[in-house]
Regions:
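Carbohydrate transferase catalytic cores enriched for Leloir-type hexosyltransferases
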Residues: 2-384
Length: 384
């Protein structure tokens, strides 16, 4: 008897896949990799850019890769991407970021990670001229509003982000589903064969030091952290602050004010995973001074490496980090200073936070995030 069961065809916009997409790239990589392992029934079409096309590999024979070498956020994305999508005869499309083409030709799901460009708009967050920034920000608001309105389901990475979406866009809470991100199995990262001392020396780092890993966008509040560190450094001359992140306009902007710190503030730039594990392992604490986060994955990854976390108490961070962090108000320099000094000096507190961190990260699984996302796909497809 012939089996006429319909095979669904699902597309995923994975142009941010992997390191080129930074934190968003990690989310997309884990979601795509896990979903195509979990679902051996549906067909998947994965849209990639030239830079990451060869990086994505799958043993699932029902997965097809499509080259969509289209820049993010531009006019070409709005015109060419719908054309590529329409050629694939998809039943459903997943956009893991807000940048959904206005004329998307198929039903879709969208993941919203935060509303930072609405809630935290600032000219300092861009290299664009003021007029161009205002125009792009205006169109951003249109694109995200239409994406949320037209999506069959909106995925949010935290309850905080869900509530922000519901309030901002006046939509029903049931249209937004929370799918927490996961924490990668950091043990799988390659360990550098060199001695830890050699790695620290390579980056001009001496112990003890505080660590931050991530970008330097204004909402990350690294300028505030540097000001607080200058107060601590006046009392603890042997302490360093290490700010790890690929050098760009935002990191370069931080350098002139720290020129007089005599090597106390280090900018290693991009650090490969093997070296980064050692930087995590030897640090005194991980400092997360952000003013706005939709989820806060970097702090969870620090916990996974066994590092105590001292964190801002803003937005989603208390929800995500729970009781496994020492919190401060990032707009109160005296409070930030006191909490950092506390984690430096109190060995019992450090051990307690490390142990709490190991327990906290068990709440977050990429496979569970993928499973919940797949459930959303299937629920929508059953109604089509």
């Amino acid at each position: 008897m012939k089996n006429n069961k319909k095979i669904n065809r699902i597309g995923i916009d994975a142009r941010f896949y992997g390191p080129i997409g930074k934190g968003l790239g990690r989310y997309i990589q884990e979601i795509v990799d896990n979903i195509v392992k979990l679902d051996q029934v549906s067909e998947y079409v994965v849209f990639l850019r030239r830079e990451n096309f060869s990086s994505f590999k799958s043993d699932n024979l029902k997965v097809k890769k499509i080259l969509a070498d289209i820049k993010w956020y531009g006019l070409a994305e709005q015109i060419l991407l719908p054309f590529l999508i329409s050629r694939q005869r998809l039943n459903l499309m997943h956009f893991p970021h807000f940048n959904v083409p206005i004329f998307c030709p198929v039903k879709f799901v969208v993941t919203i990670h935060d509303l930072i460009l609405i809630k935290f708009p600032t000219q300092r967050a861009t290299t664009l001229a003021p007029v161009i920034y205002k125009i792009k920000n205006f169109f951003y608001k249109i694109v995200i509003a239409l994406a949320i309105k037209r999506a069959r389901q909106v995925l949010a990475v935290s309850e905080y982000t869900k509530q922000e979406i519901v309030r901002q866009f006046k939509i029903k809470p049931e249209k937004v589903m929370v799918t927490y991100e996961g924490v990668a199995d950091l043990a799988r990262d390659k360990i550098n064969d060199h001695q830890p001392e050699d790695i620290l020396k390579k980056y001009h780092i001496t112990e003890p030091y505080l660590l931050y890993v991530g970008n330097a966008y204004p909402h990350k509040n690294l300028g505030g952290l540097i000001k607080v560190f200058s107060l601590i450094n006046g009392q603890q001359r042997n302490l360093q602050l290490v700010l790890v992140g690929k050098e760009d306009y935002f990191y370069r902007r931080l350098k002139p004010p720290v020129a007089n710190f005599n090597g106390a503030i280090i900018f290693p730039g991009y650090v490969p995973d093997g070296d980064l594990k050692i930087l995590y392992a030897r640090a005194r604490a991980y400092i997360f001074p952000s003013l706005y986060e939709g989820f806060g994955l970097p702090a969870l990854e620090a916990m996974a490496y066994g590092l105590p976390v001292v964190s801002s108490n803003k937005t989603s961070l208390p929800e995500i980090l729970g009781s496994a962090a020492v919190y401060f108000n990032p707009e109160n320099k005296a409070e930030m200073k006191a909490k950092i000094e506390l984690i430096i000096s109190d060995e019992n507190l450090r051990r307690e936070m490390i142990n709490r961190g190991y327990l906290q990260i068990k709440k977050y699984s990429w496979s569970e995030c993928a499973r919940q996302t797949l459930e959303v796909y299937n629920k929508i497809l059953k109604k089509l």
